[in-house]
Each structure stands twice: as structure tokens, then as C-alpha cells.
């Protein structure tokens, strides 16, 4: 009969090599994934920093009736940078999402996949939080610009309600603000100049909000759909922690009871052995 030991050993070694190769490839893939996670996190942090800088620029512009062009240009650069970075983040998160969906479609389930899903959900939520803050900052600035326009109109003797002013802003026609204003004083001219400046700022803001609207809604819907999954994960983790704590407590109790039982057993043995020794000694003495 032919000895196939060497052949089987070679086949086993080949299988082991394949397993090692798969493990190495998987580890390399996860390393690259975590590098991507750090890159995305860095982009989100950059957006957050830019949003804070945007707030400072808003305050500087509102503090001056006629802000300098340099400050306005810096604000536009910040807004453009936020838009570019946000699009990068969205693209990378979409890529991760598609990769996860592809694996789920093949009914694959692993610890690595769960890690990637959790990281993706965390980054998506953080991204939406930052962009929500940016959106709130823009909306707040729009309201403050609108308030300044309303005050300047009052200076010229023209009173408007909030609804009327909103209609004027939505018309997109700056000439509508000059309607009915008597331009016979420097105060009226200065007021109209500031009105035009604030109106221009509002138009830029609305364009920026419009450009980011679709992306923001897309990411917000994604996070909302993930919310239930995240809540489930958190629920399971909390219950797992409770279970572990109970298990530790039960183990300590078991050890305590076991220790007491062991002491009782030793005491019983001692109680049995000592009389035995006494009896043996007595009997030995009698026979002696």
C-alpha cells in the first residue's frame, strides 16, 4: 500500500499557509480601514474648527456697518473650504457604506464587519452634528443680518413686519429696499448702504445653504436609519455589562460559600481525627 503521509502533510501545510495569508490580508484591510477612519475624523475636526472661525467672522462683519472686503473674502474662503471638506467626508462615508452593504448582501457576518459598521455610524453621527452646527450658525447669521436690515429701514422711517421683510428678501431685488425711502440725508444713504450690504450677505448665505442642503439631508436620513441599530447595540452592551457584573458577584458569592464549606469540612475532619488519636493513644496505653 502506498504511503500518503507526506502528501497529506504537504496538503495540510498548504491549507495552513492559505489561512495565514487570509489572516494577513484581513489584518492589512482593517489597518487600512482604521487609517481611513482617522482621516475622516481629521476632516470632521477641521470642519468644526472652520465653523468656529466662521462664527468669529460673522461677529466681525456684523460689528461694522461697512465691513472690509478682506474679512468678507476670508469668510467666503472658509465657507468654500467647509463645502469641499464636507463633500470629501460624504464621499468617503458613502464608500464605506457601500462596502458594508456589499458584504451584508453576501450574508457575511464577522467581528470586523460589526466594527466597521459601528465606526461608520459613529463618524456619520459626528459629521451630521458638525454640519448641523454649521447650518445653525448660518441660520443665526441670517437672522442677525435680517434684524440689522429691519433696524436700518426704521432709521429711514420705513417700518416693516418680519413677514414683509421676508418677502422683500425672497424677491432677490435689492432695489425694493430703496422704494419709498427719501434720499435727502446722509443718514438715509448710510442706512441704505448697510441694507444692501446685509442683503448681499444673506444672498450668499442662502446659496451656501442651498448647495449643502441635499448632502445634509442625505446624511441626516442615513444617521436616522442607523439610530435604531445604534440603540440596539447600546442596549445589548449595557445588558452584557449587567450580566458580567452579576456573574462576577455570583462568582464571589460562590467562592465565599465554597470557602465556608471548605472550613466546615476541615473542622469536621479535625473533630473526627482528634478523638481518633485520643482513643488510639488510650488503647495503646492500656495494652502497654
Curated annotation (Swiss-Prot):
Family: Belongs to the syntaxin family.
Source species of the chain: Pongo abelii (Sumatran orangutan)
Complex and partners: Part of the SNARE core complex containing SNAP25, VAMP2 and STX1A; this complex constitutes the basic catalytic machinery of the complex neurotransmitter release apparatus. The SNARE complex interacts with CPLX1. Interacts with STXBP1. The interaction with STXBP1 promotes assembly of the SNARE complex. Interacts (via C-terminus) with KCNB1 (via C-terminus); the interaction increases in a calcium-dependent manner and induces a pore-independent enhancement of exocytosis in neuroendocrine cells, chromaffin cells, pancreatic beta cells and from the soma of dorsal root ganglia (DRG) neurons.
InterPro entries named among the record's database cross-references: SNARE, Syntaxin, Syntaxin/epimorphin_CS, Syntaxin_N, T_SNARE_dom
Protein's name in the database: Syntaxin-1A
Biological function: Plays an essential role in hormone and neurotransmitter calcium-dependent exocytosis and endocytosis. Part of the SNARE (Soluble NSF Attachment Receptor) complex composed of SNAP25, STX1A and VAMP2 which mediates the fusion of synaptic vesicles with the presynaptic plasma membrane. STX1A and SNAP25 are localized on the plasma membrane while VAMP2 resides in synaptic vesicles. The pairing of the three SNAREs from the N-terminal SNARE motifs to the C-terminal anchors leads to the formation of the SNARE complex, which brings membranes into close proximity and results in final fusion.
Residue ranges of domain t-SNARE coiled-coil homology in the record: 192-254
Originating gene: STX1A
Keywords in alphabetical order: Cell membrane, Coiled coil, Cytoplasmic vesicle, Exocytosis, Isopeptide bond, Membrane, Neurotransmitter transport, Phosphoprotein, Synapse, Synaptosome, Transmembrane, Transmembrane helix, Transport, Ubl conjugation
Amino acid at each position: 500500500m502506498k504511503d500518503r503521509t507526506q502528501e497529506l502533510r504537504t496538503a495540510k501545510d498548504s491549507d495552513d499557509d492559505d489561512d495565514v495569508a487570509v489572516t494577513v490580508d484581513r489584518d492589512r484591510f482593517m489597518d487600512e480601514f482604521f487609517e481611513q477612519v482617522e482621516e475622516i475624523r481629521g476632516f470632521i475636526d477641521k470642519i468644526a474648527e472652520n465653523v468656529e472661525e466662521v462664527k468669529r467672522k460673522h461677529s466681525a462683519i456684523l460689528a461694522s456697518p461697512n465691513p472690509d472686503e478682506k474679512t468678507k473674502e476670508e469668510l467666503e474662503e472658509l465657507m468654500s473650504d467647509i463645502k469641499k471638506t464636507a463633500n470629501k467626508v460624504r464621499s468617503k462615508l458613502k464608500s464605506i457604506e457601500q462596502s458594508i452593504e456589499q458584504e451584508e448582501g453576501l450574508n457575511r457576518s464577522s467581528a470586523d464587519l460589526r466594527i466597521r459598521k459601528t465606526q461608520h455610524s459613529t463618524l456619520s453621527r459626528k459629521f451630521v452634528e458638525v454640519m448641523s452646527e454649521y447650518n445653525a450658525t448660518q441660520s443665526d447669521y441670517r437672522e442677525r443680518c435680517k434684524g440689522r436690515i429691519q433696524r436700518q429701514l426704521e432709521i429711514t422711517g420705513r417700518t416693516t413686519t418680519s413677514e414683509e421683510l421676508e418677502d422683500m428678501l425672497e424677491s432677490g431685488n435689492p432695489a425694493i429696499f430703496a422704494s419709498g425711502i427719501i434720499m435727502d440725508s446722509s443718514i438715509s444713504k448710510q442706512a441704505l448702504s448697510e441694507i444692501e450690504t446685509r442683503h448681499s450677505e444673506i444672498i450668499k448665505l442662502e446659496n451656501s445653504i442651498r448647495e449643502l442642503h441635499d448632502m445634509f439631508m442625505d446624511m441626516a436620513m442615513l444617521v436616522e436609519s442607523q439610530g435604531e441599530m445604534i440603540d440596539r447595540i447600546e442596549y445589548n452592551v449595557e445588558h452584557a455589562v449587567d450580566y458580567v457584573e452579576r456573574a462576577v458577584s455570583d462568582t464571589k458569592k460562590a467562592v465565599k460559600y465554597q470557602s465556608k464549606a471548605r472550613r466546615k469540612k476541615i473542622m469536621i475532619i479535625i473533630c473526627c481525627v482528634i478523638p481518633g488519636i485520643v482513643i488510639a493513644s488510650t488503647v495503646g496505653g492500656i495494652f502497654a
